[in-house]
Amino acid sequence: MPLPESVGDLVVLHFETNLDDHGISIGRAPCEIHEICWVILDGKTLEKQHCESCSIREDSSRHGICGSASSLTEAIFTLDNSIQERLNFQGKPFTFVVMNGRELRVLLPKEARDQGITLPSYMRHPRLFDLSSEYAKWQIRMGAVPPYTITLSHIFGKLDVDSLPPITESKAIELSPSDAPYITKGLTQCWRLANATTLLLRKAEKDSRGHSLPSVLTQPINCQADARSFYAERSKIVHVAGLTNDVTQLELESWFTNHGVHPVALWTLKTPEPYKSTGTGFVLFASHEDAADALAFNGYCLGDRMLEIIPSSTKVLDKASDILIPFPSSKNRPRPGDWNCPMCGFSNFQRRTSCFRCSFPGPTHVSAATGSNTFSPDFPYGNSYGNGSSHFIANYGGSVHHSNENTMQSDLQHQNGNNAVNHHHSSRSFGGNVPFRAGDWKCGSEGCGYHNFAKNVCCLRCGASRATAAVVADHASGPVNGSYSHNSYSHIPPVMSTSPPNHSVYPYSQLSINSVTANHGQNFGGQNGGNVSRFDDHGRFKEVSRPSVTTDQGDWLCECGFTNFRRRSNCLRCNAPHYSNMQIPASLPSDFNAYV
């Protein structure tokens, strides 16, 4: 069955490179084209008209249909002469056939640009068939599911390419016995690719059941028409392919920004796995000029992937609008059952019954108490758990991280250091009783009432001593001195910016052990042992024995009670900064060392 007249003859093209099936360079060497091979098929009979190869080596030679050139420029010139002689001069239309369209749309233009080669117009904006896509189209038409990655070996096996004679036994090509030893691997692959094209058309013709045209290899990709439309419409949209499946919005934005263009919006396509990208997407720019400049980055690498950046249009974007979503914002992929804390937004593993960061009860506790499977708190920053929490965190200095091994320690330090998302909201604010933990205490200073963790020896808000505070006895006890009203959020600490904190935020992080000892004697971090006062589990003072503590010159004591070596500029526990010239606050208790 002949191909449509608009398709014309087929030029099966194959490049021998150091890329694997995924377009990634093998080894550390940059991508290079080692050989160009081509086979010309008649568009009406599918008979092979000509085949040739040109290897890129240091010396130039020719052995029949196999030749070599000293540079890519000479190899492209040889290919152009062959096409001009057999097709263009005779006025025959033709279409390229490649295993992967990226070879002709990305790889060849990149190599030509890097080496300063001017490609013929039909190679800069080719008309081509992507054989892997055409094969997938045929598989879907037959009711089969094509593999995620279609390789040459897969196509050759499914189409039984070896049923056709190899190049050395073909009668269509006059090959002398002396030339047979010079047949290269690349030319053999190109010949098999031409056989696969022929077999695919035959199978499609058989399956078309009387239709005038086959179902494959009828509508080529016309890069020249796409480019004309892009510049005529002054489009601001480009299509990007070749991305890794876990690329994030920030990575892609930064990549374009680093190359001098600033994208306005980026989208990828929906996938069954919500946290996984398809490796393709659309990028919208503020102006047509920026989008045109972005096309010049076609073939540039993001990591170890070579990107394909081609023109697109508003029409294409509108047709795909129903399946477009933003790129993932993070590489973390929550597993089924993981839940987001409605109070601080922290992502917790399924097994956790309370939030790892702020101890807010998990969904199992709430559902057990209310008989519901979802959170339904009267939450001022979101209507359900997992929604609106990022707004809460943005206003109160928190951050959202998945509770994996790499972020556990840093999240604990944030929890200890800034207390921006403590678990002391009132029971009425969150639809359930949120008790203090044993040892937690509420500041007794007038007008403060701040809820401090048990480790805090002084109020983190006003600096008042813990000695005058009321202490919760155990987990069963509610907030001391009553609970907060529904609209009261005065106990939320001030927002902590990312700029270096002032002395009022970390009032005790500036103290050195030796300066405290000089002002308060041996009872504070001194070298003598003895009995010191500590709070017991019921909030009462008790005398406990303390072993001798030896501190080095310059060691300093943080607000959280952690003793840091002098070399540390930030507290190891809470990350509070240390300023050696800060004065000791008057509210520092004389027995401060008892809580270290």
UniProtKB/Swiss-Prot annotation:
Any GO BP annotation: regulatory ncRNA-mediated gene silencing
Record flagged with keyword Acetylation: no
Location in or out of the cell: Chromosome; Nucleus; Cytoplasm; Cytoplasmic granule
Disruption phenotype: Abolishes siRNA production from the centromeric outer repeat region. Decreases H3K9 methylation and impairs heterochromatin silencing; simultaneous disruption of dpb4 exacerbates the effect.
SMART domains: RRM (SM00360), ZnF_RBZ (SM00547)
Domain of life from the UniProt record: Eukaryota
UniProt comment concerning the protein's domains: The RNA-binding domains (RRM domain and RanBP2-type zinc finger domains) are essential for DRI1 cytoplasmic localization and function.
Subunit organization: Interacts with dpb4. Interacts with chp1.
Protein name: RNA-binding protein involved in heterochromatin assembly dri1
Organism, as annotated: Schizosaccharomyces pombe (strain 972 / ATCC 24843)
